[in-house]
Amino acid sequence: MNSGPACATADILVAPPPELRRSEPSSLLIRLLPVVMSVATVGVMVTVFLPGSPATRHPTFLAFPMMMLVSLVVTAVTGRGRRHVSGIHNDRVDYLGYLSVLRTSVTQTAAAQHVSLNWTHPDPATLWTLIGGPRMWERRPGAADFCRIRVGVGSAPLATRLVVGQLPPAQRADPVTRAALRCFLAAHATIADAPIAIPLRVGGPIAIDGDPTKVRGLLRAMICQLAVWHSPEELLIAGVVSDRNRAHWDWLKWLPHNQHPNACDALGPAPMVYSTLAEMQNALAATVLAHVVAIVDTAERGNGAITGVITIEVGARRDGAPPVVRCAGEVTALACPDQLEPQDALVCARRLAAHRVGHSGRTFIRGSGWAELVGIGDVAAFDPSTLWRNVNQHDRLRVPIGVTPDGTAVQLDIKEAAEQGMGPHGLCVGATGSGKSELLRTIALGMMARNSPEVLNLLLVDFKGGATFLDLAGAPHVAAVITNLAEEAPLVARMQDALAGEMSRRQQLLRMAGHLVSVTAYQRARQTGAQLPCLPILFIVVDEFSELLSQHPEFVDVFLAIGRVGRSLGMHLLLASQRLDEGRLRGLETHLSYRMCLKTWSASESRNVLGTQDAYQLPNTPGAGLLQTETGELIRFQTAFVSGPLRRASPSAVHPVAPPSVRPFTTHAAAPVTAGPVGGTAEVPTPTVLHAVLDRLVGHGPAAHQVWLPPLDEPPMLGALLRDAEPAQAELAVPIGIVDRPFEQSRVPLTIDLSGAAGNVAVVGAPQTGKSTALRTLIMALAATHDAGRVQFYCLDFGGGALAQVDELPHVGAVAGRAQPQLASRMLAELESAVRFREAFFRDHGIDSVARYRQLRAKSAAESFADIFLVIDGWASLRQEFAALEESIVALAAQGLSFGVHVALSAARWAEIRPSLRDQIGSRIELRLADPADSELDRRQAQRVPVDRPGRGLSRDGMHMVIALPDLDGVALRRRSGDPVAPPIPLLPARVDYDSVVARAGDELGAHILLGLEERRGQPVAVDFGRHPHLLVLGDNECGKTAALRTLCREIVRTHTAARAQLLIVDFRHTLLDVIESEHMGGYVSSPAALGAKLSSLVDLLQARMPAPDVSQAQLRARSWWSGPDIYVVVDDYDLVAVSSGNPLMVLLEYLPHARDLGLHLVVARRSGGAARALFEPVLASLRDLGCRALLMSGRPDEGALFGSSRPMPLPPGRGILVTGAGDEQLVQVAWSPPP
């Protein structure tokens, strides 16, 4: 076994707490001192009482000797006690200080134990990094940790046992220090979050009870540990699974431990996955094995121990419960069990599948001498880990690049001169065809073969986008391969940020490690045991750097920064180019300590590089070059060739084989293959030295830190983004894209938080930049993370129809297009009504903010309101085609956030959004703009947003981002969400019959006076004349005012007897003739003269009903001081009645405030033209002041708000807005009652 970090195990002896001190006898001097003082006090008192003393004249002097006597007594009594208490206090301080020092030692021991335990039993999720390394299969049968497997993390005893010395007797013990010792032992006797391991070789079956998903996750972690730590020659892993559960264990087939040592099928060694325990016993009966671990996931459990087999059963099913391990009669509950996902177990198994004990594969012969130069020899037998361990400090960062004419190896050493190297930074120049690309590949491959990824990482840059480094991308050493920068100018700035970010990251690591001065000191600290993250040398190779600087001259500042601080930060630079123009380096040449020059086009180019023309005189042989060190020495060399084919060893014999066939690879045994005649032999492609070595490097060492993450070329899928996202910190925070942060070397979700002041959204971008997709992504993200009871959407689609694709979501109440103006208007009206209703609700319930309401909603389902989003795709089109809605939307954006109503819109330019609305938008998503100068985020960065990349844009902080594609299935969301759904926008029918409204009302509502159907729920709506005694109907001509009066008259007759209701109909245009043919008719007036007479008698009746002074309160409450029917005065065409010459109805003005008590009801219909002015007429003004109901039918909006907050608007005949008070408005369709 590889030795891990050491951990102390010797017991720590803890000193016991001190005993309480005994009282010590005072010395003779101290005992005599009170006597002496007493004598002195008596002498003073005698002196005081002598004749002629001041005491004889002033008795107050007697107090002084008395005070001396009292002070003496007190001092004598308490002095000894203070000394005793002071001694105990000092003992306590000393002991507590001792515990403090001991605590530091114990804490260090616990930290070292943590490191040791995590090294011995690492997290199963990291096991794949150990495959192929020196620790793989390290545990041998004789070792103490053989078959000892981690199962989770928890509390473990401290490695150094705390042993307390002999405690003093309880009666003599100091309670303070004893309590401190007890707390110290309780706190440090165990360590938390330590790996918990159990032995599997216990002589009996092991069962794990609990939730099946968690149990299988724990078993996957245990199996992968067994496979990584133990050789397949010493431990085999079998599976006994039912057909129902076989899919959970299909990944076992990849483990070399699961291959039968003797039995074979058509695909090779038979996988040891069986259906029953008996089948497994029969299959292994003839096999002599040291250890077999069998996973049992069937209904066949508890059959006892099987000789030579360790069985681990999926035990009793307990849904939702954590796993519990039952082993040898002991039950171990796991509070934090290990879990390994199926895909992670599959990755681990497939990595192990490439390894066999003693397996060497095909034999390869060296290619062009490179393998011998590096010290590899046979590439097939090349073990990178072994070579890396054998590389000494001198050979670190030192690699052969070729040979001199006499065959001596030429070494390139990029260590500092202080370490006998050539320096960290260098230059490579060579003309086309000179072998420059091959030299760069040789250097990169040699560096990777000689140095572990923990020592060296590479960042490979090819400005022109050639194939120089493409094959190296898969090596563990390679932090990134960056190509094709010439065609993607924004990527150059991105690389500049990435390199600057890497310098910043390394500086921060050095500061955190104790303000170390260099990476060398950092690595030295790690070697001495400091727990620091790996910080390898970063070797940056830039090909065609001259072209890079010619197009982006500002990039030289990055090279200069690396040249200045790269030595201490461990960032080494190699610049390569076909030619070196004079003055191109601009001060960088002082940092280049070594130079390699291949064949050049001219002598001047050679002199620019080497100071001589020797490179121009080199032969035309590719790979011929010169190496110049910092001392000026020139070394001629011929580059090693790594791109040539790798010669194979000649086979000793050729055996005919059956033609290959495709077979499924499963855990079931495969049927044998019938060999057919051997046809022609297919030629096997010969790998190159480069590819063969790269194949051997894969899986060895940790992956390099990613300095360069892939650009945002392809938008992510929303489903994957939501799966990988961390839990939201706010109610309405959802990820909708990815933000690229090259300086931080990370990609972070573009999270939009709509729960606060940023609840309104604007997506702005040029045509075809993905605005509609961004809105759909926002809708789908919220719908996927919230049910329809929490978020709801109402969409106005004036773009290309993209929002119609979300109509199937349960969260979407309606989608209105250009051809649906009524639905669009109703949608705005409903949202405005929702805001008013919620405002009243918040006020009535003392809710001060929507955030507070969301907290209350989470605790109680009562009165649950969803956050409502008005989504508008195509703001400019809406302003042009539905200008009347703009003001309502602006008001909604300004007021709605306080009550959970949001606005999200898209526009082509920021200028399309007026400042009054733009100021209300807190979340701004800026895609590519037609003119980057219009950007409100970052005009310079807006120029770098690529064209023809829909979804690309800038985040709020000016970083590049891409919007995710909404790949979620709306039907699936509907199935998953189920209940509830967003209420649809109710649309009234063009006509509703009177009889159907009465039939629909039922018995309870049918007893009231019905008006028609209301839009919200499509239910009949009643007019309560008991609560609101008057009704005013306003509307244009032919809008249905008279039909509304006709319906009301018939409803009064239907719901009241003649003794309870009488109607006085004022109808100057004779439109209500014969509407009532019963005893309910109290009078029909068709002229002003007749009206005066009728009203005169009505006034007398009302005056008689006025309460007399002797009417009691009970009579007033019951309205019983008069009897008779209620009088309904129905006036059609009020504008014909109230003329300039006078208004006969003025006689009723004084009775209107008392109408409810007097049984008077005034129902007035008037045209809406001039209604804003007419409402100041005394009768109508009184009605409005009294809060009467109003039915606003079709009218002109320029009249303004007549009743409530609603303006008149064009409406179909028979339709109107019934206003009953502030915030209580509903659209109704008046029941159609045909004329007689």
UniProtKB/Swiss-Prot annotation:
UniProt keyword annotations, A-Z: ATP-binding, Cell membrane, Membrane, Nucleotide-binding, Repeat, Transmembrane, Transmembrane helix
Domain FtsK: 407-607, 747-936, 1018-1201
InterPro entries in the cross-refs: AAA+_ATPase, EccCa-like_Actinobacteria, EccCb-like_Actinobacteria, FtsK/SpoIIIE/SftA, FtsK_dom, P-loop_NTPase
GO cellular component: plasma membrane
Localization: Cell membrane
Top-level taxon of the source organism: Bacteria
Membrane topology: Multi-pass membrane protein
Classification via NCBIfam families: T7SS_EccC_a, T7SS_EccC_b
Assembly description: Part of the ESX-4 / type VII secretion system (T7SS), which is composed of cytosolic and membrane components.
Protein name: ESX-4 secretion system protein EccC4
Organism of this sequence: Mycobacterium tuberculosis (strain CDC 1551 / Oshkosh)
Phylogenetic lineage: Bacteria, Bacillati, Actinomycetota, Actinomycetes, Mycobacteriales
